[in-house]
């Protein structure tokens, strides 16, 4: 929605000012979840403190009410990943999506499966899993997950595992 986008931009400009409001609307039911997601996206855009962001993110990422925003939640894990804040729970969250999420159910862009890989939940999760190569403790599960993804029925998901495969040369 246009108003949610405006809210996201306002939060990006003043993330610390809007944080209490984001927490308040997270706990309420009368305001659309679009605003919660927009506010959290604004925190990422505004380079809000990554450690504090991780605390906020962990309050919502497993909540069923946010399942329709899964792609945006996956994208937000990139902010945590670039700040070395992926823990076992978040990594497992990504692996579960990569292996079990129903999206994609069909090919969206048959002429460009690479683009398609960035526009579905399983593909995006695979991209983010590969980017977790810096975490030595996840090395085995990264490869196990990619091995399973190789059998995914959707080309775009399998392609997602190949795009960044070269970075895994850094894993022992």
Locate predicted features:
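Non-catalytic all-alpha helical scaffold/repeat segments
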Residues: 1-172
């Amino acid at each position: 929605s246009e108003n949610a986008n405006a809210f996201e931009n306002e939060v990006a400009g003043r993330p610390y000012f809007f944080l209490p409001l984001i927490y308040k609307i997270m706990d309420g039911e009368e305001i659309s979840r679009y605003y919660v997601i927009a506010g959290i996206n604004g925190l990422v855009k505004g380079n809000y403190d990554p450690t504090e962001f991780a605390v906020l993110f962990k309050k919502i990422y497993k909540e069923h009410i946010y399942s329709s925003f899964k792609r945006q939640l996956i994208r937000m894990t990139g902010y945590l990943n670039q700040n070395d804040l992926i823990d076992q729970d978040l990594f497992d969250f990504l692996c579960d999506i990569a292996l079990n999420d129903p999206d994609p159910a069909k090919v969206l862009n048959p002429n460009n499966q690479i683009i398609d890989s960035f526009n579905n939940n399983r593909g995006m999760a695979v991209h983010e899993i590969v980017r977790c190569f810096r975490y030595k403790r996840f090395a085995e599960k990264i490869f196990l997950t990619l091995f399973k993804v190789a059998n995914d029925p959707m080309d775009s998901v399998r392609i997602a595992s190949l795009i960044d495969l070269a970075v895994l040369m850094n894993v022992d």
